[in-house]
Amino acid sequence: MPSTIRPCSRADRFLKAVERLGNRLPDPVAIFVIMIGMLVAVSVLGAWLGWSSAHPVTGETLAVKSLLSEELVRQFFSEMPRTYTGFAPLGLVLVLILGAGVADHGGLFSALLRWAMRRVPDGVLIPVTILLGMLATHASDAGVLIYVPLAGLLFANTGRHPVLGMILAYVGAATGLVGNIIPGLFDVNIFGITETGAQMLVPTWKMNPLGNWWFQLAIAFSNIGLGWFIGAKFVEPRLPAWQGHGLGEDAACGQLSAGERRGLRRAGLVLLLLVGATVGLMAWPGYAPLYDYSAEAGQQLRPFFGSLVALLFMLFLLTGWAYGHAVGTISSFSDIVAMMAKGLAPLLPYLVLIFFASHFVVMFGWSNLGPIAAINGAAQLREIGVQPVLLLPILLTASALLDFLIASAMAKWTALAPVVVPMLMMLGISPEMTTAAYRVGDTLTNLISPLNSGFVLLLIFCQRWIPEMRLGTLLAANLPFAIAFYIAGLVITAGWVALELPLGPGTGVPYALPAR
């Protein structure tokens, strides 16, 4: 049956223009190579012109260094391996993916999502689908690839439009990087880059992976409520008619077998044991490696925060092992090793990208361009009198627009953080608040950007159920979510700054530079 909706002509022209622009952009690796070349040229020019600034914390004069100087060229070659392996997000990602690979390829993620979805009443199916999409982001791309088509199948089995299920699942997954119930891998990664930027100004600044948790909860509940209303009132009535196409033998895959249910029970038992062990390592008298009783208030949980990556690795590994052993996907230790290797395989493009991204970040630091640009930029903004309540919505909007040009959240933040984070620190805004504003903007255009691989995959998944569905139809369905989430994100961000609400455990909006 032909589609009952037609793409808006203006939106269609805009999308085609973005596609043409996106097709002309080089690969993200090439973008970083170009940026490194530009950085070298600017450093040479800045050193020749004598650009400098006084460091607001130490009082020392910072001068731009030419990246072609004998000292820095020697450093570039001698420290290349250390630059790559020492890049903060790299080790975090590798460790977590080793554990997540076992949980994914052992079947735990798929079974857990199916168990959760089949217990949901039809009346709250939409908000729960969005919520589970948010949680699926913690399994990285693997969770999204499993969950989005699975949501379509589960909606079809309940008599609802399968495309609606997949759109809602994708909406949750695409925005789950900022709005979520619990922090996860992305929080560790994004704050690793934030730490790199903050340490250009204050070398002792350390990240808190839970630094946006309360803010994330507010965004999550806002997006779930708005998504529920938009999905039910605007999107579902306008979707192309579905006549049962695509619902075949796969319908049974929504059911859990007896072995899968047994596996989930064992994984749940392991989860409880891990939680108990973690609490014990924080509260055992005389032996609490995850809690520093001698530290001042607000810093006592720092050992726990610093151990989150290791704890998440153990969580994924042991629950995945327990589940896989119960269902038969894991019969020996070699199976676990093989699953870890499979988990790492999709990271190969990321490992290549990080090689160039790490060099861009460290060379930015060597040149002193980052702190000098931040110091001078902060001074100019202070003279103009721009209020923080306006600065962060501007950053949010810029982040959203940049997503049409560079799809990777990590790539954009790697380029922006060395300037934006220290600049706003000098204006009294914490790195955690700056990170939160960036994250809100970054996730919005994931819903409608053809440069985002997830958006393209969503269209392919939808065409299984509606073969004639086109890009413009999907854009028309996703656009109301993006607009509503953008407006809500602006309001929440501005309100958070104005009221100076806590962002997470031990973090807030204001920031004061250390005394000299």
What are these regions (language model features)?
Residues P28-V33, G37, A41, L62-S110, ...:
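Core transmembrane alpha-helical segments of multi-pass membrane transporters/permeases
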